[in-house]
Amino acid sequence: MYADGVPKSMEGGRSENDVSLWSFCRFRDCVECCVCGNRNGAEERKENKMKVLMINGSPNENGCTNTALEIIGKTLAEEQVDSEIFQIGRNCVKGCIGCGACSKEHRCIFDGGVVNEILDKMENSDGLIIGSPVYFASPSGTLVSALDRIFMAGDKFYLKPAAAIATARRAGMTPTVDVVNRYFACVGMPTVPGNYYNMIFGRTPQELLQDEEGVQTMRTLGRNMAWMLKCIEAGKNAGIDAPAAEKKIKMTFIRQA
């Protein structure tokens, strides 16, 4: 090792950028890291891969929304980030009844459905992407019912990067994305951009793939998500702690006389 701790295998042609990348690596104790071409610690790196949960709010398993999420998933894989598509599908999802029981256990009292399953998956996920087709200029009703309960009960969302995408034949995607983004804002999740609004057009998966700009936006979103996850991980390894969440202050705008 060098005096500054950089592996000797980096001498002779290794750029300053390689050394910089190595300095943030969480596997520095393997001495010969992936930056310098060695595969020591590869199994450990594989086990510690970052993961993004992608929720498909469409009732159609292989429709346009799934196709858009698959484009993102392929890009994430190219960036060494795992992903999983969870389809809410045609399940009957109850809406939130506002009982408040989830505040204690951070699980929905209506067990046995997709809501608690998603909450369990979020515990082991580093990022979240939610996709929906447009239903009357809003997300699908099933998705909204699920999200109301998920974000009311969940406590594993704070500072995890998130993004919303929408698919449509023609219009209504802007308010659809806006509805989903508001869930992220309420629990302190930073939102990840593409290179334009996270929307893609098509009535069928085949038509969707013809929207070259939309496809590019999905790819860019995948790369940006991977980059943000890596930046957060690099910050942790550099000793930069995430800001602690303050205890929530809840007020009403109605003042008693």
Whereabouts are the PLM-identified features?
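Short, Lys/Arg-enriched N-terminal segments with co-localized hydrophobic residues
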Residues: 37-49
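Acidic/polar hotspots within intrinsically disordered regions
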Residues: 2-4, 15-18, 40
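Helix-loop-strand module that forms the ligand-binding subsite of alpha/beta enzymes
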Residues: 105-196
